[in-house]
Amino acid sequence: MKKLIIISAICIICGISTAQVPVSLKAAVDTALKNNLLVKNEQLKAQYQQMLIKTATVLPKTNIMADAGQINSIYTDTKFGVTQNFSLPRVYTSQKELLQQEWKSSVLSVAVKEALLKKQVAQLFYTMVYVEQKKQLLQYLDSLYTAFYKKASLRLEKGESNLLEKVSAETQLGQINMQLQQLQQDAAVLQIQFQLLLNSTTLFVPKPQPVKMELTATADTTKLKDHATIQLIQQQEQIALASIAVEKSKLLPDLLAGYSNTSIKGTGADNKIYGSGKRFNAIQIGISIPLFAKAQKEKINSAKFSRQIAEHNYTAGLQNIQSEYAAAVAQYNKYKQTVQYFETAALKNASVIISTANQQLANGNINYLEWVQLINQSLIVKSDYTEAIKNLNESIIQLNYFNNQ
């Protein structure tokens, strides 16, 4: 898999034609959730923990004994026996509860990994969209300077201008081409990362769609408790409680049950003579009491401390995610206002500047240096708008992550 992805990346960087498959964000996320190896690994861990639940009732090995010799008298007798130790039902119940809570924790770990994967896929997806927008902006700028370069070359041939115009245009075109090459390399790196997340050798690229995301969920801090990360932290408290119950159950006595079969040769109490063919049966019942339980009680106390740690981790984790959520909301509002400013005023002004500058240059009302300043000013506005869209999308992706979307 890695070799194929590396080969694909080399093809991209070197400009070799490879088939690209447009994909929507939803389809990309679905593919990643299905194929991503880290998610699969967490799912396997969950299956492993689920299978362990069946091991809650594990009995000690059965003891089978055989004796032969002068057991009861001068005669040689034989004795066969079997014993089995086991705990009270409460022990097995508490062990099963602990294993079930650990399994629930592993299931929540899958949810945490999936939520993070959705966020990573969305971030890469819209970063690739951003790079494509930057590429289109540079290509537009390249077309402007290419047209001017041709005019400057023609003016130089006719003696209507000096060499400065042509050299300046060549310099601008060279810088644009260098930036385009850098963008191509950035796109190749993003392609590699995207394929790794989706665990696919297919060259998936973002499907044409609006470059600006829309926030669908409203801000609601009460839902943060339902976030997979917080649920996972909270689950550690349930594991700690189950661990306390398991340690307490170890103070309960263990039971023993046995059965033996023996021969008693010679004259019995009833004055009858018995040979080896006559067998005598007996049952055995015992109990194991933890007389020296100080160490086990210390284990119980340490398990209680583990619960306190889990409680503090939950409180700290909830406070942390609430703080991050508030920061994300503030970032979203800031970038939303910035984008609105560009869309309502700055972009329109930039377009007017470009068209007016081209017209005035053609009419001879401004010189080349003035035209360059005006064009660069307007394109800085367009570039800043692209950056603002990128920042807005990132803030929305972060909020969607907190909202389990």
Tell where the protein language model's regions lie, with residue ranges.
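Acidic, low-complexity, intrinsically disordered peripheral segments
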Residues: I6-I7, V29, D384-Q405
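Periplasmic alpha-helical coiled-coil/stalk elements that build and connect Gram-negative outer-membrane
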Residues: L116-Q231, Q238, A328-Q331, Y335
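Outer-membrane beta-barrel "beta-signal"
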Residues: K79-T83, N281-L291, E387-I389, Q398, ...
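Small/polar (Gly/Ser/Thr/Ala-rich) solvent-exposed segments
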Residues: K40, L59-D77, N85-V112, E132, ...
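Transmembrane beta-barrel architecture of outer-membrane proteins
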Residues: D77, Q123, S168, Q234, ...
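Amphipathic alpha-helical coiled-coil segments
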Residues: N41-I53, K113, L117-Q136, L154, ...
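Bacterial Sec-pathway N-terminal export signals of envelope proteins
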Residues: A19-N63, F86, S94, E160-L164, ...
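Sec-dependent N-terminal signal peptides
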Residues: L4-I13
